[in-house]
Design a protein with these regions (language model features):
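Conserved N-terminal/central alpha/beta ligand/cofactor-binding core
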Residues: 1-24, 29, 70-198
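Generic recognition of flexible, low-complexity loop/linker segments
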Residues: 31-32, 54
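Short, hydrophobic/aliphatic alpha-helical segments
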Residues: 33-34, 63-75
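Short helix-loop-beta connector
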Residues: 36-39
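N-terminal Rossmann-like FAD-binding beta1-loop-alpha1 element of flavoenzymes
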Residues: 41-67
Length: 198
C-alpha cells in the first residue's frame, strides 16, 4: 500500500503468488447469470482503443452499455497515433518466448515501477488480445504462408511484436470501432458523443 500525504492508495491487487493472483481472484468472483446481465447497465468513459474494445466486449457478453465519447466519433481517439506494434507471448518463431519473459521485459522496460501483478496478468492474456484483434478484423502483417508476422521491437530479446506496418494504432482502433458500431447497431451499446464527464 502506497501513501501520498495522509491518504493511502490501495491498488486492490489480490494476495498470493504472482502467477496465481488474478486467476484465484477470477475464480472467487460470483457469476452473473446470463438472464440477469441485461439488468445491469455499464458506463464506459472514453471510446479510444481500450474503451471501444471494452464496450463492445461487454455488450457481446449481454450487458447494456453506455459509451461516452468526448469527440464526434470514436475514430478521433488518440489511440490512432500508436505505430510500433503490440507485444504478445505467442512464441511464433519458436525463439523461447514465454509469459515470464514478456513479464520480465515489460517490468524492466518500465524501470521496475509497474505493479507486477498487473503486468503478469497483461502478459498472461496477451495472446488472447491478439486473437481478439484478429477476430475484429485487424489486418496484422502476415508471412507468405498466412501466419501472423512478428518482429523484435524496443528492448525485447525475442520476436513478439505484432504489427500492421506503420499503422498499428490506426488498424487496432478501426477494428475496435467496427466491433463497437456493430454492437450499437444491435442495440447493446448506446453511444453518447460530444459528452464531457466530471
Amino acid at each position: 500500500m502506497f501513501k501520498v500525504a495522509d491518504a493511502p492508495l490501495d491498488g486492490r491487487v489480490p494476495d498470493g503468488p504472482i502467477a496465481d493472483k488474478w486467476d484465484n481472484r477470477k475464480n472467487e468472483l460470483k457469476l452473473v447469470s446470463p438472464n440477469n446481465k441485461r439488468k445491469y447497465e455499464v458506463i464506459v468513459v472514453g471510446t479510444g482503443l481500450a474503451g471501444a474494445s471494452a464496450a463492445a466486449s461487454l455488450s457481446e457478453m449481454g450487458y447494456k452499455v453506455k459509451a461516452f465519447c468526448f469527440q464526434d466519433s470514436p475514430r478521433r481517439a488518440h489511440s490512432i497515433a500508436a505505430q510500433g506494434g503490440i507485444n504478445a507471448a505467442k512464441n511464433y518463431p519458436n525463439d523461447g518466448d514465454s509469459i515470464w519473459r514478456l513479464f520480465y521485459d515489460t517490468v524492466k522496460g518500465g524501470d521496475f515501477r509497474a505493479r507486477e501483478a498487473n503486468v503478469f496478468r497483461l502478459a498472461s492474456v496477451s495472446g488472447s488480445i491478439i486473437d481478439q484483434c484478429v477476430a475484429q478484423g485487424v489486418p496484422f502483417a502476415r508471412e507468405y504462408g498466412g501466419l501472423l508476422s512478428n518482429r523484435t521491437f524496443g528492448g525485447a530479446q525475442v520476436s513478439r511484436t505484432f504489427y500492421a506496418r506503420g499503422q498499428t494504432g490506426q488498424q487496432l482502433l478501426l477494428g475496435a470501432y467496427s466491433s463497437l458500431m456493430r454492437q450499437v447497431g444491435e442495440g447493446g451499446v448506446t453511444m453518447m458523443p460530444r459528452r464531457e464527464m466530471l
